[in-house]
Amino acid sequence: NAVIPFEFGPVGEVSAGDPLGPDDFGYICFDSRDEEWVDHPVYDWVEISSDERDADFPGTKIDFEFPDRQEAWDSWNSTEVVELPFTFRYYGTDYDSISICTNGWISMGAEGAENRSPEDWAIPGPGGADALLNVYHTDLETSDPSLSGVYYHYLEDESKFIVEWYNHDFGGQTQLRQNLTFQVILYNPSV
């Protein structure tokens, strides 16, 4: 056995303008700040809320069912399953549906529908949904159900499925009324 000494040279500094990864599956996470990279996203907001006057497309509002409100933490937490118009591969598994939660997350498949927690649990773990995609995961509420909601829409000609949380607030924080609106777009991987 021989010991061969060596030193690492500088490889540069990681900055907010650099992507994260790759992980064990080869995924790399780019965001809009990674402008120096060829693969950085250029986000094109597509408004699908029927509550918005300038909606680009009419989204379908999810009619969430709220369980027995026996627990204070569970007052506005719900998850519903929506069928995808294409098969979506996520970490090596194909899915034909997603579970959409009022608390700003989706999970691949129908198994996540049993979970509606606003808590940040380990992925995977007994307290959270598996195959999770945290879009803006926190305890969220609708300030006025007639003026807010969660919508989805499929743009067939562009092969993208959009989920939008429209006009939500931080849960239980009346002083933090934010009217949060955010969305995630899933692209058909076969196109």
Q: What kind of feature is each model-predicted range?
A:
Residues N1-E13:
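Feature for long, exposed domains in two main contexts
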Residues V11-V191:
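Von Willebrand factor type D
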